[in-house]
Amino acid sequence: MSVPPLVIMGVSGCGKTTVGQGLVARIPDSVFIDADDLHPAANVEKMRSGIPLTDVDRAPWLDAVGRAMRDATAAGRTPVIACSALKRTYRLRILAEEPEAFFVLLDVDRAELERRMRERKHHYMPASLLDSQLATLEPLSPDEPGVTVPVVGPGGEVVETVLARVLDAR
């Protein structure tokens, strides 16, 4: 199975980590990377305080995301990274570092997003930033390498749907 480097994207609470980890269990020689772990401490503190990040805040983080993908690919692994990648310009920045990146936008109903964020424990992204993220989100354009997948059903079904859509798109 030939799978490109994947960016599982969307707003907080859409299931990026769950889907990404599920994909890694199905894709040989793959590695899961949580882009949240690549944020500088100052970004984490801003978000924890309920302050939305600016594009300037995100720039070094997006570069680190692209480098992490490129490094994994160079090591012979298929990176599967959970990363919001909300704007086209952010995705282009990732593509500049990893030109083979393929984006999977997880599309989740707003009420479900709110429920998920309220139930989360030990995550620095407060539910109060959901509106900011939804306002920032730019859906994938037809010329971008990626697919949008509606998130319905149990997590395992979503993983299978995502994998099928990625393989069909290639």
Regions found by a protein language model. Give the residues of each.
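Walker A (P-loop) ATP-phosphate-binding motif of ABC ATPase nucleotide-binding domains
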Residues: 5
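Hydrophobic anchor at the beta1->P-loop junction of P-loop NTPases
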Residues: 8
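P-loop (Walker A) phosphate-binding loop of NTP-binding proteins
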Residues: 11
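Glycine-rich phosphate-binding loop used to anchor ATP phosphates in small-molecule kinases
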Residues: 56-98, 106
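Conserved phosphate-donor/acceptor-positioning beta-strand/loop module used by diverse small-molecule
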Residues: 97-117
